[in-house]
Amino acid sequence: MGTGYEIGCNKCSFSRSLRVGVGMFHSSLEAEIESTSKKEQQTIKQIILGKQNLISEGEGYSIFQCSTCYALVNKFHIKIIENNQTLYESKNQCFKCNTEMQLLPCDKDENTIEGIKCPKCKSDDVQVGKNMLWD
């Protein structure tokens, strides 16, 4: 089950809703691959062609943040493993400054998003609240 969060900066007016996790649609590796961009789907399919015993250890819908300009994106994270070796893992480039974005760990039990900063004012005084469960 996925979780929806509302984040709000305590220093400025920034707020945004974000989704984290997976729902019932993502019950197979194939369904997870379909949740990525068309370009990413092509890359993944080429990498896994003919492979067996594939394991998905992705986070599902995740929050990525740029460590340079603090832009946020909410995209599907996929990590595919075969025999304890990572074959593919989602990487996101910042749409503003082209820096590789960092995957921010979310603790659904504690309602925290580790290391999140406000993309507007760069403050780390960001409030995180659960606003829905989705499937």
Predicted features and spans:
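N-terminal cysteine/histidine-rich coordination modules
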Residues: 1, 13-47
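Short linker/helix segments within small regulatory modules
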Residues: 25, 52-60, 82-88, 105-117, ...
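Exposed, interaction-prone assembly regions rather than primary DNA-binding/catalytic cores
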Residues: 121-131
